[in-house]
Regions:
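Active-site hotspot residues in diverse enzymes, especially metal/ion-binding acidic/histidine motifs
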Residues: 1-143
């Protein structure tokens, strides 16, 4: 499980600048400029030093690392595909499958317990469980 300082170190190593930027609706976003430089903007409301910040930062890093970007004119299915790529990257880094298997083997089986153990939100943990059990992020089909 990757901790918050390691996520910021990873961003720095990859030359991805993380900026304070007010984003009332989404909390965070990432952009790639024509030259390939990536930037992540995060609203102060999600920069809590904990769960929200880890989930938002890892998701936005997922966009940057996988190159999964879209614009406001993109079709909904295209947006979903890029969001899923970013989420899958984040899941693999915040909730590694081997660590999740260990947690379940130790009796940690409730979503809230798993979320607490891995330092993520319950909705993020739903995505992680869906991804590892069903191979997709369609939580609405399974929960």
């Amino acid at each position: 499980m990757v901790q918050l300082p390691a996520l910021y170190a990873y961003a720095s190593k990859e030359n991805i600048e993380v900026l304070d930027y007010p984003m009332e609706q989404t909390g965070s976003m990432s952009v790639m400029l024509e030259g390939g430089e990536c930037y992540i903007g995060m609203d102060s409301r999600v920069k809590d030093g904990g769960v929200k910040e880890r989930v938002h930062l890892s998701h936005e890093l997922g966009h940057c690392v996988t190159g999964s970007f879209y614009n406001i004119h993109a079709a909904v299915d295209c947006r979903r595909r890029h969001e899923n790529k970013a989420d899958k990257w984040a899941v693999r880094h915040l909730v590694p499958v081997a660590d999740l298997d260990d947690a379940v083997a130790e009796g940690c089986t409730e979503l809230w317990e798993l979320a607490e153990r891995f330092g993520v939100t319950e909705s993020f943990m739903r995505k992680a469980v869906c991804y590892y059990v069903h191979g997709n992020l369609a939580t609405e089909l399974y929960f």
